[in-house]
Amino acid sequence: MDKKAARIRRATRARRKLQELGATRLVVHRTPRHIYAQVIAPNGSEVLVAASTVEKAIAEQLKGTGNKDAAAAVGKTIAVRALEKGIKDVSFDRSGFQYHGRVQALADAAREAGLQF
């Protein structure tokens, strides 16, 4: 089993547990160059809010898009957009990534901006 397959296995297991709870999920996906965040409805069929470093509005403010500062900017943006839609409580879905570095920076920034998980 390679690194990617192991990550996907971990992510699938966590998602099944979150689906049983029926919780709104804050999903994070990370690549070496960008970081993406989405708030997904409890049934999993609808993306309610999204933000990423691919967006010009976010990328223009940053020195680079693959670092902790960029992840924090995405975390703050996703929290603001979610709160505007009336979403306060979410479950954090780290997609099998280790809770460290950019994933942790995004989560911390989202919490500071008012999102609860």
Curated annotation (Swiss-Prot):
Example of a GO cellular component annotation carried by this entry: cytosolic large ribosomal subunit
Transmembrane segments: none
Gene for this chain: rplR
Keyword annotations: Ribonucleoprotein, Ribosomal protein, RNA-binding, rRNA-binding
Function field: This is one of the proteins that bind and probably mediate the attachment of the 5S RNA into the large ribosomal subunit, where it forms part of the central protuberance.
Classification via NCBIfam families: L18_bact
Listed name of the protein: Large ribosomal subunit protein uL18
UniProt GO BP: translation
An annotated Gene Ontology molecular function: 5S rRNA binding
A Pfam family matched in the record: Ribosomal_L18p
Gene3D superfamilies found in the cross-reference section: 3.30.420.100
Self-association state and partner proteins as the record states: Part of the 50S ribosomal subunit; part of the 5S rRNA/L5/L18/L25 subcomplex. Contacts the 5S and 23S rRNAs.
Homology family: Belongs to the universal ribosomal protein uL18 family.
